[in-house]
């Protein structure tokens, strides 16, 4: 690739459209996350209640409201479909990339800004969560904006500029808090304070800290008071259960060892992982840059913080990716300017690795070792196309003479995977985590007056979303709606497994039960129909036979 033919200012927007927007509607929604957030937003729009989040008309206090607002607005704009469910995550990622462009473009240069954005948008963890409906992408937008505003404020020479940028930082911290809670306030504090100490500007943050907190309070207070008036115990549950127990208590959710994030960090930095050793090596001499120091603390301290917490999920380290992109971009530029052999070596390893994966997929396919059905014969070949195109781009990057050529080659490597993912996902995954196809198959059995029963909130959300119902009964484990279903006006939605047979016999309308997490109880009456597909089992009772 020749420098005269490569313009990242053109390629990056096209890349965003092709990877982040075009495939959004192609894949069915994943359970439980995407169906849960799709349904909460749908109920918000349908009910007109934008204060109290509900899930199957059950109070849902696990998260604040900003992420649900963003998802709901997306459904208002684009309708109730797969694209709208994921659109807020995609545009949040674009917003975070724009913040990085402003930050690096202002305190480094325009070329480095485009390289940083190229790295960020193509990081495997970023692109995965940017095309998947979870709240972490939206949280990352507000945190990236807050960290950008803090750095602008620290560098501002006048009082009016500092007032403006510290105020913006408070605004973005409030939006982050309204998206995922008090964690949004902790991360800026544990990063910005050490940075200001390093820069010998601690007095500055002490002088302006009150202003940041005041703005955050002003922005947060209207909804905080509204939710307290509507549901007085919201803040008690949200603070103690969702924060203290999730992250620190002995019975914290998702407990994992301290090293849990390390392999995911390596995977999440693909395809740039192959250039990372050379990039890090050539950062020597650049650490006097305040921006690079800031990025180091921004990446390292939250990573240590999340690693030390008892509760862990891969999505938690997403806020570390933006500063990592700043560091990698600076290192790659420096390595290229010094004609480092490490860049070529990394690309050779990259090319060889994905070439070997292509061969391995073909061999495993012909040996019958892939978990595929006969009708899925084409899926391995699509995966070979993905790995082959990745290897070809790695080879092109070796031959590229310009920095822009190398960057564009690496940025485009994940593109074919995301464009073809909808066709590569095997039936074994579809029939376990994507219930849309199964429910479409059984939809003729689900009349408007049928009683729907699910064995877990994940199957409940599938009934909710695909049949536009908010009156689904639960049996078995209540999971994440355990607290909400304990309210007097929601208790009737739970039927204990031991009482399920009696409940069915009392009905005068069809009963449809979806099982995934539990076996069908032997005590149930003989169903009129029983349909199984993968991990999903549906039992149907017609009103005629009682």
Swiss-Prot record:
Q: Does the keyword Glycoprotein apply?
A: no
Protein family according to the UniProt entry: Belongs to the glycosyltransferase 83 family.
Give TM segment ranges: 6-26, 87-107, 113-133, 177-197, 208-228, 260-280, 289-309, 313-333, 345-365, 380-400, 410-430, 450-467
Q: Where in the cell is it found?
A: Cell inner membrane
List the InterPro entries.
Answer: ArnT_tfrase, Glyco_trans_39/83, LipidA_mod_glycosyltrf_83
Name of the protein in question: Undecaprenyl phosphate-alpha-4-amino-4-deoxy-L-arabinose arabinosyl transferase
Top-rank taxon of the source lineage equals Bacteria
